[in-house]
Amino acid sequence: MPSANIGDIEIYFEEHGQGEPVLLAPPSWWPSDTWHVGVVPFLSRRYRTIIFDCRGTGYSSKPNHGYNIDQFAQDCVGLLEYLKISRAHSVGFALGGQIVQAIAIARPELVGTLTIAAAGAGVKTTSGVPRETRNSDDDEIAAHGFERFIRGHIENTHMAFEREFYEQHPEVVQALSDALWKRQTSPEQHRHHYEARRTWDTLGNAPRVKVPTLILCGAGDEVNRGGSTPVGTARRLAELIPNSELALVPNVKHMTFWDGEGALHALENFLRRHPLP
């Protein structure tokens, strides 16, 4: 299995396709298998598509430390350096959007373009007050079991998918649910990743981003994040990040890249208009 030695851990990664490099940063506790559902096949036709397991997930090392956005970003920088990539398109979904934002701030020379998809607001709401962050996941795991808890993030229409797509494409829903569960680790590792959400101020850090940026979100992504929603965060990010673009994809909820191909086409359009030098 391909892995990069980064500091005191190993990060599992895969590369698919040729062309300008695109780094895909996953949400908290999502193994890289999930990108194989639609996203890698779409992007790898034109781009060198790089996916990886964050520390604590999949095949990567599972230390008991380093679960914060800055460290996740440092791990990504280490992976790019290991692959001898001097600049890449950096794309992140949900918590992954915070990770690539942190990379763009700490090491802007490595980031040709930045795409923040369906990111949370971080430690503050869109109005700037501290976000309510009560971890109820342990209660849900105890009530329903770990597998049902994990798959439940995908197998629904109230948060994940628009009902029409969900009913017409059950194979996509099942494939994504299977990929999310396939290499899950443990409730303890899940807890580490949940706590990482409390370590980054997405909106507060937004003005520090100086690279071409696409803010991407489903127009129907109203999942409650303790006083904020991804679509509300997206609109605010577009106001705060200089010269950024906002793309709200119609008829799409939180599964941005999987609830139809609208977000993938928006991403491809942005990347084509911003080739790496």
Regions found by a protein language model. Give the residues of each.
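Flexible "cap/lid" loop of the alpha/beta hydrolase fold
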Residues: 101, 105, 112-146
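Acidic catalytic loop of the alpha/beta-hydrolase fold
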Residues: 220-229
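Gly/Ala-rich beta-loop-alpha elbow adjacent to hydrolase catalytic centers
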Residues: 92-96, 100
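Active-site loop/oxyanion-hole signature of alpha/beta-hydrolase fold enzymes
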Residues: 50-91
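Conserved alpha/beta-hydrolase catalytic His-Asp/Glu region
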Residues: 149-198, 204-205
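Catalytic histidine-centered segment of alpha/beta-hydrolase-like enzymes
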Residues: 249-264
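Short beta-strand/loop motif that positions the catalytic acidic residue
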Residues: 209, 215-217
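Conserved HGGG/HGGXW glycine-rich cap/lid loop of the alpha/beta-hydrolase fold
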Residues: 7-59
